[in-house]
């Protein structure tokens, strides 16, 4: 997914539905991330969503709700090819995250891939360590003080910026698509600079296609645009706004 030099366009699944996952998987995304942190999705929802996504060429990822080995291992066994891990603040936490994603001797992931043996074949364990994408989220005040030690941790493939929590961490209001006049924007560029220095991928969550394009032009390798829930809401609102009954007048001869 991230070997051809092109930026990855990532979709975001917050709706606990195979129908939504299927619709998203057929829209041309390079990858889809199932959000198990802030979305409405739990494991029982995520498993059939992963099965649905696996009928396409889209790479399935998941954002776990915490840097907790059991949850990371279980969702990997369910069919994820990458983990977005929130709130990674220092090297020790980065090491714990990486090791939960990798089989010995590189980590302590327990062997029991279940679906992996179906879609990855009997040699799944031989190549899983190299194929699983590991993105550590930079979004805490402490992480901003430890960028190089996090990014230089062996096995960390890249970082992922959560602009909302990052903004809160530095005393600004939460939100996506930070203006260039904000401190959060300056920190985003500083994080990107450190990622490039450490030769790892840099990802960021965006609210609009315009901002995602801007971030690609700045050098980000991995951009997420909104989510299925936001797209549904925006599409529905645009439809209603276009044909708003509050602006229509019935003909005088219309039967009541």
Show the residue positions of the predicted features.
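N-terminal amphipathic alpha-helix/helix-capping segment at the start of soluble metabolic enzymes
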Residues: 1-10, 122-128, 190
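Conserved N-terminal beta1-alpha1 strand-loop-helix module at the mouth
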Residues: 1-60, 66-67, 155
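Conserved, mostly hydrophobic/aromatic
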Residues: 11, 35, 83, 97, ...
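Active-site-adjacent beta->alpha loops and helix N-cap segments on the catalytic face
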Residues: 38-52, 68-71, 89-102, 115-122, ...
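Conserved anion-binding
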Residues: 70, 85-153, 165-168
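Catalytic cores of alpha/beta
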Residues: 70-81, 93, 145-151, 208-218
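Glycine-rich phosphate-binding active-site loops on the catalytic face of alpha/beta enzymes
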Residues: 85-90, 163-168, 221-237
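Conserved small/polar residues in nucleotide/adenosyl-binding loops
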Residues: 246-252
């Amino acid at each position: 997914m991230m070997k051809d030099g092109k930026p990855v366009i990532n979709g975001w699944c917050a709706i606990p539905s195979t129908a939504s996952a299927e619709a998203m998987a057929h829209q041309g995304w390079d990858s889809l991330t199932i959000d198990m942190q802030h979305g409405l999705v739990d494991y029982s929802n995520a498993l059939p969503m992963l099965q649905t996504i696996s009928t396409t060429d889209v790479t399935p990822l998941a954002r776990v709700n915490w840097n907790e080995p059991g949850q990371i291992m279980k969702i990997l066994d369910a069919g994820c090819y990458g983990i977005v891990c929130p709130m990674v603040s220092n090297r020790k936490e980065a090491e714990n995250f990486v090791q939960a994603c990798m089989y010995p001797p590189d980590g302590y992931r327990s062997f029991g891939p279940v679906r992996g043996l179906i879609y990855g074949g009997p040699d799944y364990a031989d190549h899983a360590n190299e194929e699983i994408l590991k993105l550590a989220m930079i979004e805490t005040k402490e992480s901003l003080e430890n960028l190089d030690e996090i990014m230089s941790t062996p096995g960390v493939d890249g970082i992922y910026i959560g602009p909302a929590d990052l903004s809160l961490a530095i005393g600004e209001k939460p939100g996506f698509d930070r203006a260039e006049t904000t401190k959060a924007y300056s920190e985003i560029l500083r994080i990107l600079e450190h990622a490039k220095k450490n030769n790892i991928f840099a990802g960021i969550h965006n609210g609009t296609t315009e901002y995602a394009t801007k971030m690609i032009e700045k050098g980000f390798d991995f951009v997420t645009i909104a989510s299925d829930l936001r797209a549904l809401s925006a599409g529905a609102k645009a439809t209603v706004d276009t044909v708003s009954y509050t602006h229509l007048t019935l003909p005088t001869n219309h039967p009541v």
